[in-house]
A protein has these predicted regions:
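Short linear recognition/processing motifs and adjacent strand/loop elements at protein termini
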Residues: 6, 84, 94-100, 237-238, ...
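Short beta-strand elements
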Residues: 156-169, 177, 198-310
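Charged linear interaction tracts used for macromolecular binding and regulation
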Residues: 62-232
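Long, polar/Ser/Thr-enriched low-complexity segments
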Residues: 1-91, 256-310
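Intrinsic structural disorder
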Residues: 1-11, 16-18, 25-26, 35, ...
Length: 310
């Protein structure tokens, strides 16, 4: 049998396909930044967390009512797609922690978390293999601001609620006191950490693992005054940010702005020649691929902590 194989044809991208590829790559890069920022909460994620986060970001950007395809990012997005996103579906926060909570902003623009009463015995539903080990719990709220157009994020404030296995605490309101920058997207996560008491030294060991680590994004607020897209690569400097905030600011390897700039060049080139720039090579390096999270992050299971007295 003779097999005749022809030479593969060059794939010519249309302007629309280039926009779609750019938007997908931008979503992947954005999701990677969010996962990195929430690393303490994201450490014990399940195997599909990366793809799930990218999908939520992609849907958010596609749901934009203000930006045009290929010229928009998460600052234009419908952030409702991010609310409720679980970092570990093996132990969903919404199922493990049976506590009413609401997040809002008051007249001063501060973020307010209203947390219902918690009876640890009934409100915290642990898997059977953890029930006899856990003696204390910590509920952590992490507020992080993102400015993708200036390529940084900022740790704004953390709040903890601590409770023992047999304790009941009353309903409470937490007001985040940090002054909130108007150019940042604000994301708030909620994480439940379980601890085992160590009688010898009165410390507690963390029990969270990839099999049990309830954590989710519970609120997302759009930037009030989003910055303009940068016309050239960022200098990765903290220009314009008060020095007092520098210790909490993290500069990021975000690719979204570069992808949008390159898309404009490709479309202009195609309009002139009828052939997209670098069509033969495809320039695939400009579009990040989604890869499942790998590597060996520091395992904090068994990490000892001390609880303050209330």
């Amino acid at each position: 049998m003779n097999i005749i194989q022809g030479r593969p044809k060059k794939f010519k991208q249309t302007a629309e396909s280039m926009k779609s590829a750019t938007e997908f790559g931008l979503s992947s890069s954005t999701a990677g930044v969010i996962r990195s920022a929430f690393e303490p909460a994201y450490l014990y994620r399940d195997g599909t967390a990366a793809a799930r986060c990218t999908q939520a970001v992609y849907r958010s950007i596609r749901g934009s009512l203000t930006g045009f395809k290929g010229q928009r990012d998460l600052h234009d997005g419908d952030l409702s797609w991010l609310r409720g996103m679980e970092f570990n579906i093996k132990s969903k926060l919404s199922e493990v922690l049976q506590v009413n909570h609401q997040v809002s902003r008051n007249e001063q623009g501060q973020i307010v978390v209203s947390l219902g009463a918690i009876a640890a015995k009934t409100a915290i539903r642990l898997p059977a293999w953890l029930q006899q080990q856990a003696s204390r719990y910590r509920i952590r709220f992490s507020l992080i601001g993102f400015n993708f157009r200036r390529e940084y994020y900022e740790y704004l404030e953390f709040r903890d609620v601590e409770i023992s296995r047999h304790e009941t605490i009353e309903a409470q309101q937490m007001v985040f006191q940090t002054e909130l920058p108007k150019d940042q997207i604000l994301l708030l996560s909620m994480t439940l950490m379980a601890y085992k008491g160590m009688l010898a030294d009165q410390e507690s060991a963390l029990l969270n693992s990839r099999e049990f680590s309830p954590s989710a994004l519970i609120a997302a607020f759009a930037a009030e005054e989003a910055a303009e897209f940068p016309g050239e690569p960022m200098d990765q400097a903290l220009t314009g940010i008060p020095e007092l905030r520098w210790p909490n600011v993290v500069l990021i390897g975000y690719e979204g702005n570069r992808l949008i700039r390159e898309l404009g060049k490709k479309i202009r080139s195609k309009a002139k020649t009828g052939v997209p720039e670098s069509s033969a090579q495809g320039n695939r390096k400009s579009i990040p691929k989604i890869r499942p999270d790998s590597g060996s992050p520091e395992d904090l299971t068994g990490k000892r902590v001390s609880f303050g007295k209330r």
